[in-house]
From Swiss-Prot:
Its cofactor is FAD. The lineage of its organism: Bacteria, Pseudomonadati, Thermodesulfobacteriota, Syntrophobacteria, Syntrophobacterales. InterPro entries: FAD/NAD-bd_sf, GIDA_C_N, MnmG, MnmG-rel, MnmG-rel_CS, MnmG_C, MnmG_C_subdom, MnmG_C_subdom_sf. GO terms for molecular function: flavin adenine dinucleotide binding. Its main location: cytoplasm. HAMAP family: MnmG_GidA. Homodimer. Heterotetramer of two MnmE and two MnmG subunits. NAD(+) binds at residues 269-283. This is tRNA uridine 5-carboxymethylaminomethyl modification enzyme MnmG. Belongs to the MnmG family.
Length: 642
């Protein structure tokens, strides 16, 4: 039977999360992949997470996705980054066994009762009127669906470049998809062109590791997932080295052979993951660039040479690698390459990641102009949830920017669009003190439960933990410690000033040199508390003032977010708006005044005009007084229209 409620095209990180979400929400779901041997493949770095990206992984886990759990099962190194800064920008990063990750995720898909996994090369979408009804593969087989998620990665008109050699491919050795890209254009979608790449893979036995600095993982690794009880695999090291002036000279001398610099590649490169050619040419004064050797797994000789990505001819690549101290004898098992591919300008999508042009069509991952496994997985989960809700006739699932990094990413894409590969950063979030890795479950797990992506037991555990956090914060506030020789000795051992008067425990915990463990020595809780509780208590206590200030900012932000704009609003009928802004508003079709303020080029005056129009339109309905501040970050006069 070829009729499904949700079909997902592509089985990369976006496709896997989309399919699992839809299936677990009760939809009969089909995943179609060009090759079932590369489900959840990691075509570039053998790692997950990092600053910002780790936040996404935790949020995926909290909502009910599977990336965090599979990452923990297959991780061979854990590191918590940015620990010298505040907890808002801490980021977990893992090295992963690529083969085990792929196998584990595929097993997860195959074990899901509502989910079918098939190998097929989708060539076209079946559209009736302006509504999706299914897909058709290369063999002419039709698969019907109420909703379709496109998670095509780099396969739309993919073109791999190594020197003067260019090959049509979605990844090295895999078929590209040209008919589907052509059809998207015929349907009216605006496509752009982007470029990414991957470095060489080296043979482990051919590397002189003594010339590199060993980088160990954390001694007490903390998993990504709430549901991971222990770390399963042996932990290994990475190794840090650097390029040599010989390396840079080789790049400069042969730059005319790089497709990136001779005009062959027209796609826009990733700003935050530059190739070696870009680093050498853009930063000529730098004496060296960092190289990190990352193991690709426990059972393979392949080592990922991070920092050596380029698109130069193979013979030049060999010379580049051999110019690096410690890699003089290195065997190149796979050459570096660049890849160009098509993407759909994401302003053509709604906040659900559903298309504005074709009802029931959703898009997730690199097709939306993003880069990174984590960004793809997050969009896949978001799109899969909404595709399932669409198929079931239920209201859509949308978060706002104050609730999750996932929402920041989606809002950036659908409101502002992108002309270069988009990557998440903590700096993109206005309310990052509230959107920490450590509280992702407190923010989002209940929503995952409501969607049917978590069990009742998970919801019960969350309620109990939330209660324990609340009770301990209250105990710290009400319990006073009196000065004594023992108390002051404990404080002195932690380089903290002595007490000369009774002090509440929460005030002591606010001292930067003290942590919860020390305060608990002075006055232990009635019952032992889990680390999940005590870590949250410490953060909420130490940063209480900052958190309250940001919560007040969120309250202002939500005033604008709650001022809805009708989807059918005719912007051409609003006097006082420039033609440029009418076009932008008509293209994005913001759902709220808040979203309208974030459209590039939107001015405070234009927002005021829009507010006046909405207020007049709503005469007889609710008055829009709460939204007289035309934007949290636009510094306009709040009483201008009073």
């Amino acid at each position: 039977m070829n009729k499904y409620e949700v079909i997902v095209v592509g089985a990369g990180h976006a496709g896997c999360e989309a399919a699992l979400a839809a299936a677990r929400m009760g939809c009969r779901t089909l995943v179609l992949s060009i090759c079932l041997d590369t489900v959840a493949h990691m075509p570039c770095s053998p790692s997950v997470g990092g600053v910002g990206k780790g936040h996404l992984v935790r949020e995926i886990d909290a909502l009910g996705g599977r990336m965090a759990l599979i990452t923990d099962r297959t991780a061979i190194q854990f590191r918590l980054l940015n620990t010298k800064k505040g907890p808002a920008v801490w980021g977990t990063r893992t090295q992963n066994d690529k083969a085990r990750y792929r196998i584990s995720m595929k097993h997860c898909l195959e074990s899901e009762p509502n989910l079918d996994l098939k190998q097929a090369h989708v060539e076209s979408l079946a559209v009736e009127g302006n509504r999706i009804v299914g897909v058709i593969d290369q063999l002419g087989v039709f698969f019907g669906a109420d909703a379709v998620v496109l998670a095509t990665g780099t396969f739309l008109r993919g073109l791999v470049h190594i020197g003067t050699t260019s090959v049509e491919a979605g990844r090295a050795g895999e078929l590209a998809s040209y008919p589907l890209a052509n059809q998207l254009q015929r349907l009216g979608f605006t496509l752009g062109r982007m470029k990414t790449g991957t470095p060489a893979r080296l043979g482990r036995r051919s590397i002189d590791f003594s010339r590199f600095r060993e980088q160990h993982g954390d001694e007490a690794p903390k998993p990504f997932s709430l549901f991971t009880d222990s770390i399963a695999l042996p932990q290994v090291s990475c190794f840090i080295g650097k390029t040599h002036q010989r390396t840079h000279e080789l790049v400069r001398r042969h730059i005319h052979l790089s497709p990136l610099y001779n005009g062959t590649i027209r796609g826009v490169s990733a700003r935050y993951c530059p190739s070696l050619e870009d680093k050498v040419m853009r930063f000529p004064d730098k004496d060296f660039h960092q190289i990190i050797l990352e193991p690709e797994g426990l059972d393979t000789e392949e080592v990922y040479a991070s920092g050596t990505g380029n698109s130069l001819p193979y013979d030049i690549q060999l010379r580049l690698i051999h110019s690096v101290p410690g890699l003089e004898e290195a065997e190149v098992m796979r050459p570096a390459y660049a890849i160009e591919y098509d993407f759909v300008q994401p302003t053509q999508l709604k906040a659900t990641l559903g298309s504005k042009l074709v009802e029931g069509l959703y898009m997730a991952g690199q097709i939306n102009g993003t880069s990174g496994y984590e960004e793809a997985a997050g969009q896949g989960l978001w799109a899969g949830i909404n595709a399932a809700l669409k198929a079931q006739g239920r209201p859509p699932f949308i978060l706002d920017r104050s609730e999750a990094y996932l929402a920041v990413m989606v809002d950036d894409l659908v409101t502002r669009g992108t002309n270069e590969p988009y990557r998440i950063f903590t700096s993109r979030a206005e309310y990052r003190l509230l959107l920490r890795e450590d509280n992702a479950d407190l923010r989002l797990l209940e929503k995952g439960c409501e969607l049917g992506l978590h069990s009742a037991d998970a919801a019960k555990e969350l309620r109990e933990r939330r209660g324990a956090i609340r009770n301990e914060l209250e105990r710290l506030r009400l319990t006073h410690v009196r000065p004594s020789a023992q108390v002051n000795q404990t404080l002195a051992e932690n380089h903290s000033p002595p007490l000369d008067a009774p002090a509440p425990l929460d005030k002591l915990l606010k001292r930067p040199e003290l942590n919860y463990s020390t305060v608990a020595i002075l006055s232990p809780p009635p019952e032992p508390l889990s680390s999940k509780v005590t870590e949250q208590v410490e953060v909420e206590c130490k940063y209480e003032g900052y958190l309250k200030r940001q919560e007040a900012e969120v309250a202002k932000f939500r005033q604008l977010e709650q001022a809805a704009i009708p989807e059918d609003l005719m912007y051409d009928d609003i006097p006082g708006l420039s033609n440029e802004l009418r076009q932008k508003l008509g293209a994005v079709r913001p759902l709220s005044l808040g979203q309208a303020t974030r459209i590039p080029g939107m001015t405070p005056a234009a927002v005021s005009v829009l507010m006046v129009h909405l207020r007049r339109r709503a005469q007889g309905g609710p008055f829009l007084a709460p939204v007289l501040d035309p934007g949290v970050n636009m510094h306009s006069q709040k009483k201008k229209l009073a």
